[in-house]
């Protein structure tokens, strides 16, 4: 379970960084 928790925290960290950059910069992909 330790490895699962580590992967979960790492994924959440990457997601936070991704959303921070995505919302900081203007959206380039328009649908």
From Swiss-Prot:
It is found in: Cellular thylakoid membrane. It is a single-pass membrane protein. The keyword Glycoprotein does not apply. Coiled coil: none annotated. GO terms for cellular component: photosystem II reaction center; plasma membrane-derived thylakoid membrane. SUPFAM superfamilies: Photosystem II reaction center protein T, PsbT (SSF161029). One of its GO terms (biological process) is photosynthesis. The keyword Nucleotidyltransferase does not apply. It comes from the Bacteria. The chain crosses the membrane at residues 3-23. Pfam families: PsbT (PF01405). Keywords: Membrane, Photosynthesis, Photosystem II, Thylakoid, Transmembrane, Transmembrane helix. Belongs to the PsbT family. Found at the monomer-monomer interface of the photosystem II (PS II) dimer, plays a role in assembly and dimerization of PSII. PSII is a light-driven water plastoquinone oxidoreductase, using light energy to abstract electrons from H(2)O, generating a proton gradient subsequently used for ATP formation. PSII is composed of 1 copy each of membrane proteins PsbA, PsbB, PsbC, PsbD, PsbE, PsbF, PsbH, PsbI, PsbJ, PsbK, PsbL, PsbM, PsbT, PsbX, PsbY, PsbZ, Psb30/Ycf12, peripheral proteins PsbO, CyanoQ (PsbQ), PsbU, PsbV and a large number of cofactors. It forms dimeric complexes. This is Photosystem II reaction center protein T. It comes from Rippkaea orientalis (strain PCC 8801 / RF-1) (Cyanothece sp. (strain PCC 8801)). The lineage of its organism: Bacteria, Bacillati, Cyanobacteriota, Cyanophyceae, Oscillatoriophycideae. The gene is psbT.
């Amino acid at each position: 379970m330790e490895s699962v928790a580590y992967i979960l925290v790492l994924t959440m960290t990457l997601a936070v960084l991704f959303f921070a950059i995505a919302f900081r910069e203007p959206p380039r992909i328009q649908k």
